[in-house]
UniProtKB/Swiss-Prot annotation:
CDD domains: Trp-synth_B. Belongs to the TrpB family. PANTHER family: TRYPTOPHAN SYNTHASE (PTHR48077:SF3), TRYPTOPHAN SYNTHASE-RELATED (PTHR48077). This is Tryptophan synthase beta chain. SUPFAM superfamilies: Tryptophan synthase beta subunit-like PLP-dependent enzymes. The beta subunit is responsible for the synthesis of L-tryptophan from indole and L-serine. GO terms for cellular component: cytoplasm. Tetramer of two alpha and two beta chains. Its cofactor is pyridoxal 5'-phosphate. The keyword Lyase applies. Its EC number is 4.2.1.20. The gene is trpB.
Length: 410
């Protein structure tokens, strides 16, 4: 299998206007445009600053605990009876997910820009926890917007955020999920542009956020290249990751986009099934439109109104997807599939029993796709799955589903 070529066309985006093909851009209120342009300038300067890079590397290593292990899942591999399965163990990071990679990068940028107040949106609560964590570490005020539906199903994370000193503001609008939390955070930002830094948690939002979040998450894929090279002496044959907004996936995928031999698979949340309309699969069941400052694939009705997304996993419950994913779907470089709630739950249980690892329900969607594909593949096929987070936060949800299914059987 060939190593990366010098041709990095697919990794060069976005263009100066923040576009990946026809996706992305900057669709923001006039009051925000100067701030967005300033943020883009500051980020470009930080990327070239050796002191910034050195400080980021220090915190990734000594605070986050990187590199995260690339673990050969021997029992999952035996169970599937085909491809050799490796897990990229992002759940072992400080705070229990990949989210901290991006938060450390952005908090250093916020400090560089002299901002004293941090705001963020959160769905599953993991980005909220990671944001509250870095705000505490750097002594900055922190406000987290979270939908009431998500607050109900992620109470442990709400408590963790408060413990870390953040103010958690419940959002009752809409379905009380991630989309609504992001709407409120954007409103706050417009009102408090001078003092406030909006720490977006995924590869969405107006430019430069999709590229910036991707760059901070790309440490996942860079480490995976080196680790698999050390363990197997070659590149993976396929990569698999779950997708909500898509930051954990983009972090794994981006360093491999120009390696044509590497098959890349993104897994959306099919909820109750795409055909039911109760899902969060923007690429498999959506159309292009504009939301939260960028053009991408969205779940919307014939009038262009955003349709409520559904997933058992709070972190995948978003009616859009990062614009770079939309572009990669459009050009056919990445395959985007989907997995139902039930399939994800089954994979969650298998991973617990076979590997002694409790994955997040988000990551369980990626595992479910692996369970479909791995048995059909040869034993020398190397498959890397991004285990994006741990499942502690999902105990209530899983218990509820186990109790419900017991009742249905009786």
């Amino acid at each position: 299998m060939t190593q990366t070529s010098n041709n990095s066309d697919l990794r060069n985006g976005p263009d100066a206007n923040g576009l990946f093909g026809s996706f992305g851009g900057r669709y923001v209120a006039e009051t925000l445009m100067p701030l967005i342009l300033d943020l883009a300038r500051e980020y470009e300067a930080a990327k070239e600053d050796p002191a910034f890079k050195e400080e980021l590397a220090y915190f990734q290593r000594d605070y986050v605990g990187r590199p995260s292990p690339l673990y050969f899942a021997e029992r999952l591999t035996e169970f599937c009876g085909g491809a050799k399965i490796y897990l990229k163990r992002e759940e072992l990071n400080h705070t229990g997910a990949h989210k901290i990679n991006n938060c450390i990068g952005q908090i250093l940028l916020a400090r560089r820009m002299g901002k004293k107040r941090i705001i963020a949106e959160t769905g599953a609560g993991m980005h909220g926890v990671a944001t509250a964590t870095v705000a505490a570490r750097f002594g900055l005020d922190c406000v987290i917007y979270m939908g009431t539906t998500d607050i109900e199903r992620q109470q442990a994370n709400v408590f963790r955020m408060k413990l870390l000193g953040a103010e958690v503001i419940p959002v009752v609008a809409g379905t009380g999920t991630l989309k609504d939390a992001m709407n409120e955070a954007l409103r706050d930002w417009v009102t408090n542009v001078d003092s406030t830094f909006y720490l977006i948690g995924t590869v969405a939002g107006p430019h430069p956020y999709p590229a910036m979040v991707r760059d901070f998450q790309a440490v996942i894929g860079k480490e995976t290249r080196d680790q698999l090279q050390a363990q197997e002496g070659r590149l993976p044959d396929s990569l698999v990751a779950c997708i909500g907004g898509g930051s954990n996936a983009m972090g794994l995928f981006h360093p491999f986009l120009d390696d044509k031999s590497v098959e890349i698979i993104g897994v959306e949340a099919a909820g109750y099934g795409i055909e039911t309309g109760k899902h969060a699969a923007s690429l498999n069941g959506g159309v292009p439109g504009v939301l939260h400052g960028n053009r991408t694939f969205l779940l919307q009705d014939d009038d262009g109104q955003i349709i409520d997304a559904h997933s058992i996993s709070a972190g995948l419950d978003y009616p859009g997807i990062g614009p770079e994913h939309a572009w990669l779907h459009d050009i056919g470089r990445v395959q985007y599939t989907s997995v139902t709630d039930d399939e994800a739950l089954a994979a969650f249980h298998q991973c617990c029993r076979l590997e002694g690892i409790i994955p997040a329900l988000e990551s369980a969607h990626a595992l479910a796709e692996v369970f479909k594909r791995a048995p059909k593949l040869p034993k020398d096929h190397l498959m890397v799955v991004n285990l994006s987070g741990r499942g502690d936060k999902d105990m209530q949800t899983v218990m509820h589903h186990m109790e419900t299914s017991k009742q249905e059987k009786h």
